[in-house]
Amino acid sequence: MDQTELNELRTLRHSASHILAQAVKRLYPDARLAIGPAIDTGFYYDFDTETTFTTEDLESIEAEMKKIVKENLRIERFTLPRDEAKKLMADEPYKLELIDGLEEGAEISFYKQGEFTDLCAGPHVAYTKKVKAFKLLSVTGAYWRGDSDNKMLQRIYGTAFASKEELDEYLNMLEEAKKRDHRKLGKELGLFMMTDDGPGFPFFLPNGMVLKNTLIDYWREVHKRYGYVEISTPVILNRRLW
């Protein structure tokens, strides 16, 4: 994929994020919008809402997105002076914060599709119907601006491609990756266990110790073959060392 194709895919995914936001606003009018960029694997949008999104909610939101695509809404760009921009976004506190963060004299642009308008630098596709192959994948928490002192928002992740074939190929890859997830395999093979007493720290079980020691033995063999020697250092040291 060349740079032109990558840019086109990124634009498509960015537009998919706006369609996601429009669908959420239709189904949950009280939801407040944060940001919704394209990313390397697809797109996401952050929402501030009292509703805790579930897997079933994602299915409903995706169905609404498909309706918006079928409506073939024109996506139009326009700009406004700062005062008018803030009036337009008066009910969107996160958008107001973004506007306030723009430099004086900066262009403030919006994109409109049907009843939905979002603060955005773009670019976007011309019509919603161009976003044909997409899928919502998951929902997770995300702090506003990535700062734990700010409110926790809900981030919906999705992906989009130029064709259904590409989308299906990607979704199949994700399914295969899940089958090979070390957390899944570790439990199924009895390699290790996790406990709330040490979140993120595995407790190796007998099968896991056999595998771990086999890997360590191989590691030692390779290092010895190439002339390396082994040392051992303390686990805890004074912080001034760093």
Q: Which residues are covered by each model-predicted region?
A:
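A short beta-turn/loop motif at secondary-structure boundaries
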Residues: 37-39
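Auxiliary tRNA-acceptor-end handling modules of aminoacyl-tRNA synthetases
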Residues: 1-11, 23, 32-35, 44-242
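Metal-associated gating/positioning segment near the N- to mid-region
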Residues: 26
